[in-house]
């Protein structure tokens, strides 16, 4: 719909043959109907795909105020955008709720691209929220800006340099809403890193289990929960990820667990000892 909007707004659009215009109108109405159905299904409410659907509706609403069967195109676009943004972003914690540190990076770019007026509808100040998302990247990266390999995050993924600007004196951070606790210790030459997932349920782009662990010591990774060694765009990446559970979770009675987790607590005992507690539902 975004491409079709650009075509229609081009000065040469009115010179097109009527048969082509009719085909374009038919395609646009089919798209409006499909996105309206997606909205009613609520299936994409906690995914970035829902945001893209909503933005497509808002784009085409510049030209088509009403779709087939009296659909209010802009109203659905606005409501869909508000709902899906709240589904993929924790306004309280300033992070993406999609179960992948890679998608936190996409979340930064996505928020940057959305008009301020729509973000303000759900209580987000664009610049302030992006700053908080960038601050969170301190906890989502280990050495050399490498992203913590959680869920659909390739082990070779990195955060952009301009999106890792913070430094922290604290070593322990829990994102309760995001379902993640991180212990991070930096020295001049290395970073020691531990992360544990304790989400209430699987999020988009996450593995189908709970309580997976990531462990790095002296810049070497010992345990990972990742989308594998394949870069984005590789056919193998998606197949590898979707066929896998996280690679380091306990099997109870030789069976994987898919019902989410309950976070109990996290605390620092002394300078080098930390306790993170969670349990399977």
Task: Locate the predicted segments by residue.
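Extended polysaccharide-engagement surfaces of secreted carbohydrate-active enzymes
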Residues: 97-281
């Amino acid at each position: 719909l975004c491409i079709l909007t650009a075509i229609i707004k081009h000065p040469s659009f009115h010179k097109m043959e009527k048969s082509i215009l009719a085909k374009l109108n038919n395609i646009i109405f089919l798209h409006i109907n499909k996105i309206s159905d997606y909205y009613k299904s609520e299936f994409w409410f906690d995914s970035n795909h829902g945001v893209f659907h909503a933005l497509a509706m808002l784009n085409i609403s510049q030209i088509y105020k009403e779709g087939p069967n009296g659909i209010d195109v802009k109203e659905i676009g606005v409501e869909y955008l508000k709902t899906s943004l709240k589904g993929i972003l924790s306004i309280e914690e300033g992070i993406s709720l999609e179960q992948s540190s890679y998608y936190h990076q996409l979340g930064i770019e996505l928020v940057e691209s959305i008009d301020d007026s729509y973000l303000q509808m759900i209580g987000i100040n664009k610049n302030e929220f992006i700053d908080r998302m960038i601050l969170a990247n301190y906890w989502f990266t280990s050495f050399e800006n490498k992203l913590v390999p959680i869920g659909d995050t390739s082990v070779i993924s990195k955060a952009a340099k301009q999106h890792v600007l913070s430094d922290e004196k604290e070593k322990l951070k829990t994102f309760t809403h995001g379902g993640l606790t991180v212990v991070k210790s930096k020295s001049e030459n290395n970073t020691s890193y531990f992360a544990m997932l304790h989400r209430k349920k699987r999020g988009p782009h996450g593995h189908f289990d709970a309580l997976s662990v990531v462990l790095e010591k002296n810049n070497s990774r010992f345990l990972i929960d990742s989308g594998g060694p394949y870069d984005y765009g590789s056919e193998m990446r998606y197949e590898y990820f979707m066929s896998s559970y996280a690679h380091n979770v306990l099997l109870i009675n030789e069976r994987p667990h898919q019902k989410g987790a309950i976070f109990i607590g996290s605390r620092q005992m002394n300078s080098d000892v930390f306790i993170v507690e969670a349990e399977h539902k």
